[in-house]
Amino acid sequence: MPSPRAPEPSDAPEAAEPTDVHGSSESAGSRTTPSTPSTPPAPPAAPETPRERAHRLLRHPVTIATAAAALLHVLWFFFFANTGGDIAAQDAWAEFVGRHPGSAYNLAWYGGMHPVSYSVVSPYLMSVLGVRTTMMIVGTVSSGLTALILVRVPAVRNPLACALAGVFAFLCNALSGRVTFGLGMMFAVGAVAAVFCWPYRWRYKRWAKAAVAAPLAALATASSPVAGLFLGVVAAALFLHKRRPGAYAIGLAPVAVVGLSAWLFPFSGTQPMSLGTLALPVLFSVLVFVLVPRDWSTVRTAAAVYGVGTLLTYVVDSQIGSNITRMAMLFAGVALLAALPYAVPRSRRWYALVLAFAGLNFWIGFKSVDDIVRTAPAASWNRELAPLVNQLQQVGAERGRVEVVPASSHRESSALAPYVQLARGWNRQADMERNPLFYDDTLDPLSYREWLDRWAVHYVVLPKDRPDNGAVQEAELIEQGQPYLREIWGDQNWKLYRVLDPVPLADPPATVERAGAGGVTITVKSPGRVLIRIPYTRWLALVDEDGKVVQRPQETEESKLRSKDDETAPKTYVNTHGCLNKVEEGPYGDEWTELLAPRPGVYRLTAPYQFEPGTPCPEELS
């Protein structure tokens, strides 16, 4: 019985060497055939011709899986890729960083969000390559890397079939539109391949293996924190089996990336997870643990860690939530199919494996089709948006926020973000954190008016498209008619409402001239403190008309001399260009931005990346 445990790099065969099912390998030059005195040695095999070598490579599982994945992702691009669902969010982020590549804060959604809180890498890569092109590339490469791992692990007796199961799983990921997660998984599978497919002749160069695996693990987490969580499961399984070098190589970098990004670009929110969502990933983690051979210790431990982690995710609210199901959707089928040759045909275990594998693929296939149907945007979003945009521009909607009742496709999050600041967007964690009334059954005419005032909403758009689950009550409330909403325009696709007596985005003595995704321009009529209803971040800065960050308040020379004589003496600052404070307001504890304006004039707020973020006021001026 071959060992089904994935080999350590020191056990793994060299890529150019043949590997038997026991995981041992011998070079062609050292392999000999025992002979009897009466039997002469066999003649040496004829060298492989280029045609034979090409034929062998074309039939290799990695080649077949990669080619199949490439073809299927091209078909996805032409026939199934749309502009709704997760694709809408990724389109919005890619367009934002394309228009504002140096901005650390996107003001088009939820008052303000850091691009890094979504992904460090994917918005910029998608902006360059295109969202759908990125999906085709990462799905194809991930399928090829998965096939490589399956070929190199001696325990896998049916690598081609398992590789094709992986191709189907990555195709379903594309059908659901998860480009950012797919990008992270490409790097994650690459990191795992570096650990498990390390060449035999380099088996003692563990530092080199770590130098390859760790950056890939960091890129995986920087692309998608959920992909980093997958690496955490693999690292935990390796660590528990005392395979520490591999565990450290792929497990430490994700922790560092998550910690650093959370410190520099804080974000909080909760991704919901229902009991129905919990059931299937836990079920398949149990099936993998029970049905694979008992000596597949690493696989079984990973399944157990994943199952426990899924239960904890359900019990403890977090930003992961239902996203944790994606790991089972990608790899449970591969593990179950790899275990099939170890079961006696037509035994109970064999039938259980077949049924589990079929059930897994039915689940991910049905979920993908459901995602396509549910998130397909109405044609009006692509063909008849211009009249709505024209009306928003005519009424000056760019001076406040606009609430577009979220459609099931969430197409509004990308279609209108370039033109106005949206009160909402497409990030479930942020929506539940900042707008809980849409989820906790507290929405009524009074609370809705309070919410409109809280976020300085000046206009409300009601699409005729089917609303999102978190917007059904809102759409019904608006349709009923509210005294503080006045319909000012409509056609067969949209209704536009003006909010009567809206709360301004910036309090007097300031007026907002323009509020866009990349910044806000306000005119201050007299010096003083101005409350601006933008969630505070350390990256917000004041810039001049050329976009250059203005000088921060400077300590006076007299104050510096006083501090030399007495460290406890109060400091004095000259605030020449203005500075920004964080202030709390309202019953929700909102942390808004306050401008300390030293003189009348025009002030511009943006959030450029810089070593000393923002234009904060010193404590003495706060």
Region annotations inferred by a language model:
Residues 140, 182-193, 284-286, 331-337:
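Alpha-helical transmembrane segments of multi-pass membrane proteins
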Residues 145, 167-171, 183-203, 209, ...:
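Specific aromatic-rich, kink-prone transmembrane helix
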Residues 347-371:
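Internal/C-terminal transmembrane anchor helices
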Residues 109, 196-209, 240-248, 336-352:
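Membrane-interface junctions at the ends of membrane-embedded or membrane-associated helices
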Residues 74, 81-90, 100-103, 110, ...:
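Transmembrane catalytic cores of multi-pass membrane glycosyltransferases
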Residues 1-13, 19, 28-75, 621-622:
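Start-transfer (signal-anchor) and selected internal transmembrane alpha helices
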Residues 368-622:
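Extracytoplasmic
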Residues 74-161, 165-185, 189, 225:
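Active-site lumenal/periplasmic loops and adjacent helix-entry segments of GT-C-fold
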